[in-house]
Amino acid sequence: METTKKVTVETTIQAPVEKVWEFWTEPTHIKKWNSASDDWHTPIAENDLRVGGEFRSRMEAKDGSFGFDFGGIYDEVKNYEVIAYTLGDGRKVKITFKGKEDTTEVIETFDAEETNPVEFQQQGWQAILDNFKKYAETNI
């Protein structure tokens, strides 16, 4: 049996964990930060944040040349601490939120998929997380 490679991306945000959680989980906010670069956007975001609940977002190139759906089912939700889910293809993702005073560390670990090189996946997920940091710090 092949072992799935786990990849971790992380950042520290200058905002309290309650605000970071709100920005991460509410669809109105997700649509504004969920992209790896300025030429992409997320026109659709839905989120039923509870164990067994589903989430879905649609990421598209702004020029309409490409797009894909991203979604899964929540396995664990601990407010202001942990979100874990299983993607449609069976891969697992866990996000940990560590709040301390007015900063929040966000650590995201995911099972790598087998189509693209791990480095590209890590760069893509880190770029989205960096965009989230920028959005959160600009909107607190």
Each predicted region: which residue ranges?
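Hydrophobic ligand-binding cavity/cleft-lining segments
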Residues: M1-W40
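Short, surface-exposed coil-to-beta transition loops
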Residues: K6-T8, F66-G71, G90-K94
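Generic structural detector for well-ordered beta-strands
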Residues: T8-Q14, D48, R58, I73, ...
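A short, structured loop/turn motif at beta-sheet edges
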Residues: V17-E18, L49-R50, D75-Y80, T96-E105
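Hydrophobic pocket/interface hotspot
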Residues: V20, I30, F55-S57, Y74, ...
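Glycine-rich portal/gate segments that line the openings of hydrophobic small-molecule binding cavities
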Residues: H41-A84
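Beta-strand/loop substructures that line and gate deep hydrophobic ligand-binding cavities in soluble
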Residues: V82-A127, F132
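Short, highly charged C-terminal tails/helix-capping segments
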Residues: Y135-I140
